[in-house]
């Protein structure tokens, strides 16, 4: 905890020095003490009745902050308070309470939310329906709750979150919702059909490929890739000429999925257009075309030769994509080209070679993976191990050897696999479990805990050993690991030990300063080799996240790091010092889930699980409603949006600076 306190103070210091003193006037904050205590409770993940009762006596703004805080504290005592705030005189408070109840995931809140769904304030009703979707309510019960409202009002409250109800009955509702004249409601109806599609929605999805809204065309194409058939390829083909990149990218992915799934053959009439898209000036389109082209590589000499040439002559990111595409398509030159890439000087390309080798399978790919397993880069070793374990279900000895790797990420991957596969007893794995969790690299530790719990379910003879390990993990160690171990014990029907506060090292004075520094939005520039992206940081909605981001930026933490994840028409992600999605600053911060939405240009905190954020952030390239209420939104791109579409995998972040 001392280390975390020092880290926080350093971050505050970095924020203070990133601008002159005159740039940071003291902000007068009403009810500063109460707001600071609420932030302290969120950070400690604890409920305090005295603080709650004091906040309830405050004005509407303070009561709204209370509702937000209670939604971020996993304590059922907060549910009763929030249900009372659902009938507050102020609409802003009722909205915050409705959203917060959805975040608490307590099914007993459903009764109060059904009533709130028909609140006089539409937004409160929308948020109540969203919360009911998160809590697993039946859509028929939501409809019954909305019956007293006019029909247009019912649609306005139901459609934005209809996709959250995982029932086949939503298909008919969404199809009716498509008739709404409000373009946004029409789009949300289409999203509900597309996000987790049911096969019976196929006829409607096919029609939506010609919708006037490019978002709808893209969503429909994606859905057809999941539930469509080979008969859908002719309907997808026109989207290769779509004027918007979203539908084009999703049609390429859908075709690749249908072919890879054995539902279709690679159509010859796509070849010429696909070949042209391999040289498209838009990086996202080009990347998607390269990925899809693997499905044509073996049957089309033109496509196969183009991909083979790209592995040698393209930019590094293109070479890696082409290499994996050739391996996935079983092209005859793939093994030779993968072996060459395995000896490349570029770490990212060697990691891609490991992925390709895994797709080649054994024994050909195994020879390449054997060499990469001893690579100097932990990133390459981790990729080689993951590929090897995926290709060979009998790779127990490989995993055991990896437990001795000096890198925690490699050890974590091995431990996760060994815990899931009964080739080693849990008693044998216990020493490795103790050392797998490292702050800032929590994904491996969380995966190991879940794998141990899964072993308890699948191997009755080891249930006792698994429970003992989980009890040990729940009793000590980092908060997120203790919480996960306790949750897994509960699922196994075992007593869940009391959860000690997450953060004990910071006093109220630290939180007062954070509240004062984050009472207003701040602005930063993310300077990249492709141009500058200007982001307004929504500090009032996510103060801990914003102060952390500003502190890291002020220290120069982001200087020279890369965008290690680029998914066209979805997100770009950066901020990992390891460059592979497993790294962080050496600590984690609390989630601050809020009501800001993941439209294009939203900036969110990347996670490996609840409360595991640190330095990695992502920016959405298109609207992503399914991310709403699941990841902290802490910023919005306000200038330089065109740069987002030019970012390539591996592009560098030159610097992140705060600007006026």
Where are these regions (language model features)?
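Sec-dependent signal peptide recognition
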Residues: 2-9
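Glycine-/small-residue-rich active-site loops that bind phosphorylated ligands and cofactors
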Residues: 105, 120, 150, 541
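Cyclophilin-like peptidyl-prolyl cis-trans isomerases
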Residues: 15-17, 407, 424-427, 431-660
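Bacterial Sec-dependent signal peptides at the C-terminal "C-region" and cleavage site
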Residues: 14-30
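HEAT/HEAT-like alpha-solenoid repeats
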Residues: 50-58, 83-87, 111-118, 141-148, ...
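Structural detector for internal amphipathic alpha-helices that build alpha-solenoid repeat scaffolds
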Residues: 25-46, 53, 61-76, 81-84, ...
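Residues that form or flank phosphate/diphosphate-binding pockets in enzymes
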Residues: 108, 200, 231, 364, ...
């Amino acid at each position: 905890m001392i280390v975390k306190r020092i880290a926080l103070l350093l971050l505050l210091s970095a924020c203070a020095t990133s601008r002159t003193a005159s740039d940071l006037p003291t902000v007068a904050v009403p009810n500063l003490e109460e707001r600071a205590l609420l932030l302290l409770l969120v950070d400690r993940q604890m409920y305090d009745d005295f603080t709650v009762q004091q906040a309830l006596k405050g004005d509407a703004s303070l009561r709204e902050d209370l509702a937000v805080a209670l939604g971020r504290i996993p304590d059922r005592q907060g549910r009763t308070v929030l249900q009372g705030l659902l009938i507050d005189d102020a609409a802003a408070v009722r909205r915050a309470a409705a959203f917060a109840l959805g975040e608490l995931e307590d099914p007993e809140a459903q009764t109060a939310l059904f009533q709130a769904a028909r609140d006089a304030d539409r937004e409160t009703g929308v948020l109540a329906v969203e919360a009911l979707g998160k809590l697993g309510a039946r859509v028929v019960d939501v409809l019954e709750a909305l019956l007293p409202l006019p029909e247009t009002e019912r649609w306005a409250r139901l459609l934005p979150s209809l996709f959250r109800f995982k029932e086949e009955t939503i298909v008919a509702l969404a199809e009716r919702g498509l008739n709404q004249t409000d373009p946004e409601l029409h789009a949300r109806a289409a999203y509900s059909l597309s996000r987790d599609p049911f096969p019976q929605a196929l006829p409607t999805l096919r029609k939506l490929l010609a919708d006037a809204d490019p978002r709808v065309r893209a969503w429909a194409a994606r859905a057809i890739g999941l539930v469509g058939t080979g008969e859908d390829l002719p309907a997808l083909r026109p989207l290769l000429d779509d004027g918007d990149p979203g539908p084009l990218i999703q049609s390429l992915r859908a075709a690749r999925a249908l072919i890879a799934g054995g539902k279709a053959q690679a159509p010859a009439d796509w070849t010429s257009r696909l070949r042209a898209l391999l040289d498209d000036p838009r990086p996202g389109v080009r990347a998607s075309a390269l990925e899809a082209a693997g499905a044509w590589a073996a049957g089309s000499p033109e496509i196969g030769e183009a991909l083979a040439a790209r592995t040698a002559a393209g930019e590094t990111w293109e070479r890696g994509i082409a290499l994996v595409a050739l391996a996935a398509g079983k092209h005859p030159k793939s093994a030779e080209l993968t072996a060459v890439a395995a000896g490349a000087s570029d770490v990212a390309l060697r990691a891609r070679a490991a992925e390709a080798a895994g797709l080649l399978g054994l024994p050909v790919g195994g020879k390449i993976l054997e060499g990469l397993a001893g690579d100097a880069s932990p990133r390459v070793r981790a990729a080689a191990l993951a590929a090897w374990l995926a290709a060979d279900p009998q790779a127990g000895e490989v995993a055991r050897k990896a437990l001795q790797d000096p890198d925690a990420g490699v050890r974590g991957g091995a431990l996760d696999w060994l815990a899931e596969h009964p080739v080693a007893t849990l008693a044998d794995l216990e020493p490795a479990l103790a050392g797998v969790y490292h702050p800032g690299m929590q994904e491996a530790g969380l995966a190991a805990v879940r794998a141990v719990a899964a072993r308890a379910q699948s191997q009755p003879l080891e249930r006792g050993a698994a429970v003992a390990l989980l009890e040990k993990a729940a009793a000590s160690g980092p908060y997120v690991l203790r919480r996960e171990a306790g949750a897994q014990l509960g699922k196994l029907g075992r007593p869940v030990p009391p959860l000690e506060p997450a953060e004990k090292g910071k006093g109220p004075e630290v939180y007062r300063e954070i509240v004062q520094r984050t009472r207003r939005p701040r602005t930063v520039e993310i300077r990249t080799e492709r141009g500058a992206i200007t982001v307004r940081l929504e500090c009032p909605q996510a103060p801990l996240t914003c102060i952390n981001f500003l502190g890291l930026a002020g220290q120069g933490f982001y200087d020279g790091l890369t965008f290690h994840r680029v998914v066209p028409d979805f997100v770009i992600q950066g901020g990992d010092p390891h460059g592979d999605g497993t790294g962080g600053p050496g600590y984690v911060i609390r989630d601050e889930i809020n009501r800001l939405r993941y439209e294009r240009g939203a900036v969110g905190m990347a996670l490996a699980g609840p409360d595991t954020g640190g330095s990695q952030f992502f920016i959405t390239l298109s609207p992503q409603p399914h991310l709403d209420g699941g990841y902290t939104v802490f910023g919005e791109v306000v200038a330089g949006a065109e740069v987002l579409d030019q970012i390539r995998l591996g592009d560098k972040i030159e610097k992140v600076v705060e600007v006026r």
